[in-house]
């Protein structure tokens, strides 16, 4: 009997996990949300300029005026939210404008100054110029046709590349132009030599003819063997006291009027006249050689 009574004892009531209505009401009534910040206060983020100022330890009021929470006067950009402001102030464009601002005010950050000053301290050793490539051992290697093309001013990395260049159209075109120029130079040199020979022979021929008509006389320098010969007016300034025709410009003389007029019509005389005219014009303009 005792055992049966112990088995059939009523179980105690467990406390319910749900709180009473009054407690729930009190908990919901006392629940407070965190205070929301104003729209202008949300954008108070750490700016790139403020970080640089914190590193420098010197407040820059002018930079603070330029970098507002929602407006960057330094970049002339209007910002709509805190996220956009953070992205702008941490971007590359704002950092570049900030570096330009420091450079304009002659106050770069000290970290940059130390990084720039280190390579300057290393002494510079002048290297004498050398022709060709030089190995560390000191041996100079001269460039060959497989390394460099002097005509096209092109360098090659391997003999295969050099062979392809020499068989190409550009190299062939340059080669034809160089050959044409060399031929033109040789032709002009030969023409100049022929011209000098022709001029020399003409001068000798005229001088020999002048010597043929020269009359030896003891009557004086103003003796004219053909005083009765009529001298035309256009050649009056070209007659010597001895009665010979003389061209001072070409240093050529002739005994007869026909021969002298042939000289005046020659290419040698005309070229000398044009050259003298050009020199006189240049002297009148002030270009004196």
Curated annotation (Swiss-Prot):
InterPro entries, per the entry: Matrin/U1-like-C_Znf_C2H2, ZMAT3, Znf_C2H2_jaz, Znf_C2H2_sf, Znf_C2H2_type
Positions of region (Disordered): 180-202, 265-289
UniProt key word Protein transport: yes
Main location: nucleus
Zinc fingers (Matrin-type) by residue: 70-100, 147-177, 245-275
Induction pattern: By DNA damage in a p53-dependent manner, and by 6-hydroxydopamine (6-OHDA) in PC12 cells.
Tissue expression remark: Highly expressed in brain, gut, lung, and testis.
Any one Gene Ontology BP term: protein transport
GO cellular component, as recorded: nucleolus
Compositionally biased intervals (Basic and acidic residues): 265-282
Sample GO molecular function, one term: RNA binding
Keywords, sorted A to Z: Apoptosis, DNA damage, Growth regulation, Metal-binding, Nucleus, Protein transport, Repeat, RNA-binding, Translocation, Transport, Zinc, Zinc-finger
Subcellular location: Nucleus; Nucleus, Nucleolus
Gene3D superfamilies in the record: Classic Zinc Finger
Assembly and interaction partners: Interacts with dsRNA.
Functional note: Acts as a bona fide target gene of p53/TP53. May play a role in the TP53-dependent growth regulatory pathway. May contribute to TP53-mediated apoptosis by regulation of TP53 expression and translocation to the nucleus and nucleolus.
Name under which the protein is recorded: Zinc finger matrin-type protein 3
Gene (name only): Zmat3
């Amino acid at each position: 009997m005792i055992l049966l009574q112990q088995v059939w004892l009523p179980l105690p009531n467990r406390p319910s996990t749900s709180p009473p209505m009054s407690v729930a009401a009190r908990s919901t009534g006392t629940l407070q949300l965190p205070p929301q910040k104003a729209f202008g206060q949300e954008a108070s983020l750490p700016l790139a300029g403020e970080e640089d100022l914190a590193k420098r330890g010197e407040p820059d009021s002018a930079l603070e005026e330029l970098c507002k929470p929602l407006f960057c006067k330094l970049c002339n950009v209007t910002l709509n939210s805190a996220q956009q402001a953070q992205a702008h102030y941490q971007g590359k464009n704002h950092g570049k404008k900030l570096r330009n601002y420091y450079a304009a005010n002659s106050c770069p950050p000290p970290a940059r100054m130390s990084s720039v000053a280190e390579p300057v301290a290393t002494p510079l050793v002048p290297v004498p110029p050398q022709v060709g490539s030089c190995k560390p051992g000191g041996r100079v290697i001269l460039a060959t046709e497989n390394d460099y093309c002097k005509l096209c001013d092109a360098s090659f990395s391997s003999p295969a590349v050099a062979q392809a260049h020499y068989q190409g159209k550009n190299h062939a075109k340059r080669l034809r132009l160089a050959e044409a120029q060399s031929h033109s130079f040789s032709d002009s040199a030969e023409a100049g030599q022929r011209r000098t020979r022709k001029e020399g022979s003409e001068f000798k021929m005229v001088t020999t003819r002048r010597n043929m008509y020269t009359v030896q006389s003891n009557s004086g320098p103003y003796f004219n063997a053909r005083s009765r010969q009529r001298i035309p007016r256009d050649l009056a300034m070209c007659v010597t006291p001895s009665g010979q025709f003389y061209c001072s410009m070409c240093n050529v003389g002739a005994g007869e009027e026909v021969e002298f007029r042939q000289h005046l019509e020659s290419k040698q005389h005309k070229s000398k006249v044009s050259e003298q005219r050009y020199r006189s014009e240049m002297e009148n303009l002030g270009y004196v050689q």
